[in-house]
């Protein structure tokens, strides 16, 4: 039974999110492209690499809207829009496509990945202690990130309202504003606290974030799986990003 659909905009993102579930022994499948047979899926978690990272905002919107529509028609309840932890790609267009097509009122978005020092404070996204626009991602040769304030970045591509909120305390009510709700997180504990608040009244239909928050979903969603899994020991990666190279060296 499909418990969760994850929409990632590139192959790396699909894998680094899918592994959060596979590592817990949860049946996980990764597919590439927008032609997906949801009825034929036999995994608990389906990760779709939509290949929309480098498309125009309009084309990316269309792909996410199509997949959202088809997934809901097939009975998929929960959808997670996986975003880049450095805020690259068509984030505003894709979040708005998911929200508008679903008919839901709000979409909680937790962009932080504190496990690798990417955090959100007072609505501003930081990479290794500096605003993302001042990090290497701000001078990316293909997709420089132009806004560190997450709501401003979202607003570049959509008219859907976006609001910034501090970390939710466990038991705290989810804000009632309709639109995209961006939550701060400076630690894994912050992500977990907001996650528990979001799940307090049941499983959300829509969620968004990077692999950081996705790592908490197996427990938040109470997904069945084996907790001890043998993983391969060899990793081969080619990447132009200096932060990625330094992570591998360390």
Kindly give the residue locations of the regions a language model identified.
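Short gly/pro/ser/thr-enriched loop/turn and capping motifs at secondary-structure boundaries
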Residues: 36-38, 114-118, 213-216
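Cap/lid and interdomain-hinge subdomains that line or gate substrate/regulatory clefts
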Residues: 1-3, 27, 31, 44, ...
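Short, structured active-site "lid" loops
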Residues: 45-58
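Short glycine/serine/threonine-rich phosphate/pyrophosphate-binding segments
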Residues: 13-17, 90-91, 191, 216
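Short, flexible loop segments at boundaries between secondary-structure elements
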Residues: 210-234
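N-terminal signal-anchor module of multipass membrane proteins
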Residues: 5-25, 52
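Single conserved hydrophobic/aromatic residue that forms the stacking wall/gate
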Residues: 238-250
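Soluble secreted/lumenal catalytic domains
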Residues: 23, 202-204, 235
